[in-house]
């Protein structure tokens, strides 16, 4: 089955399952290929009920698909239980928190339990970050990575569930929001003063208000735009728009903010892409109709090219992707130098230990990237290929007005 045909079937299944669209499937579908691809995209659970109601699957593939969905729903229940215990612990210690993504995105799905869940990400005020972290340690949560593994969060585990406590977002911490990091951080902190309680079945949890929750989901798409985007992140945004972002809400609430942080065009293109290919309704979501359909298709092609919507990459490809990331998003000398310096401090153990070495971290990182490039099969061709891919990404990001100063 050709990739284009396979992707079209996946898109159609999602249109039917999420929005009850009428679709016509070909007769010779390789359902094993479709299932494997949807597993990789972490969306396998979404069309299962629709397929079963139409007796489309043969017994063997239906049984296999059912096992995946049963496991997924079981994990969802376990995660929601652990999330509830976390919320109770934070509440007991007078720490305001909100859930990021996860169940805060699942609330917009027709069947929230069929959205594949990953970690429990939650946000606290930076002033409460260390307090909350030490409370977690005292209550049986264990470090999954060193404390300084990331500048914006700490990762812990308990009962086989991963928790990430955030004091900001990754894309803000790495300053990939066009020098709007302070503005966005202030906006998130403002959201902590207007926490909303949401409910899925018997599970209640705190979320940001509509504006902050939507911006978090949009920033999450951008965060994964380069390293490999999954269909799940796109669908999270699409389902949010479907529930919350009609023309009036866009005009009064979102457009002024997104225009200020230079993400208006990206939101328009992404949303129109969802209308053209994934079944998002057109009625009362006309704010994205100015989008260039060719650019929508370019963006979709980019998602497909970046590892089939986030397919797990080989180590060498990941290293290549990191270099492309640097070239694509840090186009001024100052930003490029700062990225090298920040990455060098993060990766150079001696610089972490001895502060006298930190001013030279950018040199360490430059040599590190050079070594990664040369330590590959056909290094010259690989570096030229990376450069061409970077140029292609820069052109796309320019059209989308992303990563501008």
Residue ranges and their predicted role:
Residues 1-118, 124-405:
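Conserved NTP-donor binding/palm subdomain of two-metal-ion nucleotidyltransferases/polymerases, i.e.
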């Amino acid at each position: 089955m050709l990739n284009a045909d396979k992707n079209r079937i996946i898109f159609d299944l999602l249109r039917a399952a999420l929005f009850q669209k009428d679709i016509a499937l070909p007769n010779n579908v390789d359902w094993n290929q479709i299932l494997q691809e949807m597993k990789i995209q972490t969306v396998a659970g979404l069309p299962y009920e629709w397929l079963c109601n139409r007796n489309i699957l043969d017994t063997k593939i239906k049984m296999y698909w059912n096992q995946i969905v049963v496991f997924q729903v079981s994990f969802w229940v376990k995660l929601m239980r652990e999330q509830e215990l976390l919320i109770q612990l934070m509440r007991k210690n007078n720490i305001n928190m909100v859930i990021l993504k996860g169940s805060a995105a699942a609330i917009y799905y027709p069947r929230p339990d069929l959205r594949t869940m990953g970690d429990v990400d939650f946000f606290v005020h930076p002033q409460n970050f260390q307090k909350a972290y030490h409370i977690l340690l005292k209550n049986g949560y264990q470090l999954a990575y060193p404390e300084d593994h990331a500048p914006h969060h700490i990762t812990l585990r308990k009962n086989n569930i991963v928790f990430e406590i955030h004091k900001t977002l990754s894309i803000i911490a790495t300053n990939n929001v066009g020098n709007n990091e302070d503005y966005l951080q202030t906006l998130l902190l403002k959201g902590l003063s207007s926490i909303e309680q949401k409910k899925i079945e018997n599970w209640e949890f705190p979320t940001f208000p509509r504006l902050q929750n939507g911006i978090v989901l949009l920033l999450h798409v951008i965060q994964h735009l380069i390293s490999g985007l999954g269909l799940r992140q796109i669908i999270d945004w699409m389902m949010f728009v479907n529930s919350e972002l009609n023309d009036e809400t866009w005009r009064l609430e979102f457009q002024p903010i997104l225009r200020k942080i230079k993400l208006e065009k990206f939101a328009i293109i992404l949303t129109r892409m969802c209308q053209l290919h994934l079944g998002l309704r057109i009625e009362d979501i006309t704010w994205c109709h100015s989008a260039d359909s060719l650019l929508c298709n370019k963006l979709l092609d980019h998602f497909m090219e970046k590892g089939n919507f986030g397919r797990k990459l080989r180590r060498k490809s990941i290293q290549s992707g990191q270099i492309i990331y640097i070239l694509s998003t840090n186009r001024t000398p100052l930003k490029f130098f700062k990225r090298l310096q920040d990455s060098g401090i993060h990766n150079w153990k001696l610089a972490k230990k001895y502060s006298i070495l930190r001013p030279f971290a950018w040199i360490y990182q430059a040599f590190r990237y050079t070594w990664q490039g040369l330590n590959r099969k056909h290094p010259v061709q690989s570096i030229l290929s990376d450069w061409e891919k970077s140029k292609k990404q820069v052109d796309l990001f320019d059209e989308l007005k992303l990563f501008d100063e």
